[in-house]
């Protein structure tokens, strides 16, 4: 079976078994967590600038804690801009946000991440999902 194949090919790997829904949820949740982390550190960067502090000094001190992984703490990001860009983070934050709304579950944190990101970037990568109801397409 498939599990035996992966065990044979990757004997040292930890293999997790889950449903496709659980797997897709994990991928989306991780990307949304990283997007929130990027947004949080960008806001700390702006605060440091307003206080006349060196963000990188403070970030490096924070990272000595070892509870905070340094990934996604560089500001500006790899594209030289504030907040998150690329394809996956904007797509996944919007998709999960819309899904949370349809499920009528709490979504204020993710909503704030998306809203604040959109204030920092005007690049239209954070796709707005619009209802096509009553519209001619």
What is each of the regions a protein language model found here?
Residues 4, 49-137:
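NAD(P)-dependent Rossmann-like dehydrogenase/reductase catalytic/cofactor-binding core
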Residues 1-71, 99-103:
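Internal alpha-helical scaffold of NAD(P)-dependent oxidoreductase catalytic cores
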């Amino acid at each position: 079976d498939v599990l035996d194949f992966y065990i044979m090919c990757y004997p040292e790997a930890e293999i997790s078994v889950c449903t496709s829904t659980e797997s897709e949820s994990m991928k989306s949740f991780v990307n949304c967590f990283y997007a929130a982390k990027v947004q949080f550190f960008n806001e700390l960067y702006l605060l440091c600038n307003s206080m006349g502090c060196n963000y990188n000094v403070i970030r490096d001190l924070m990272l000595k804690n070892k509870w905070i992984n340094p990934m996604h703490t560089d500001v500006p990001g790899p594209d030289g801009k504030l907040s998150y860009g690329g394809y996956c983070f904007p797509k996944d934050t919007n998709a999960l946000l819309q899904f949370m709304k349809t499920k009528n579950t709490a979504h204020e944190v993710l909503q704030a991440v998306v809203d604040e990101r959109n204030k920092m970037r005007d690049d239209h990568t954070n796709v707005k999902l619009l209802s096509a109801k009553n519209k001619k397409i």
